[in-house]
Amino acid sequence: MDEVKAKTPHGEMTVDQLAEIQPGMAAIMEEVGKRYTFTYYAAKGGNWKLAAYHLNQLRAAFRTAKVTRPKFADDLTAFDKEYLQPIFKAIHDQNWDEFEASFKRGELGSDFYHEKRGVSYIRYALPAQVPSNLYQGPPEKFQREGVKKEG
């Protein structure tokens, strides 16, 4: 039987080659950490829709990991249920105190799963500064420097 190949504009690839280039947990978790940080600062800035967007993107990264690294699927599902869903509820309720408490529990949950997986040397730490490459506040307050808002 012929080996199944995918055709791209750059050539053909085997299914095994496609499997080999899937992101590992380190790359996925880098995205997760970034989205967790953005979620926090968007909520803190009062941009609840943006906080929900970032948390949804974090969950999308979890879905990718469940497919590409299935041995982590149960832990990712449990983390989502125990830690991310309460954050979503706080975002939905636009409740900063509930959000902050749930977010901190999520940090502890991250520590737990890193310890469980034998990588206790990995610890998420919320950056002290708001990420500067994306506006995190309410959209109606956004103003580009040197540009007058129309209307």
State where each predicted segment sits.
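C-terminal-biased regions
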Residues: 1-151
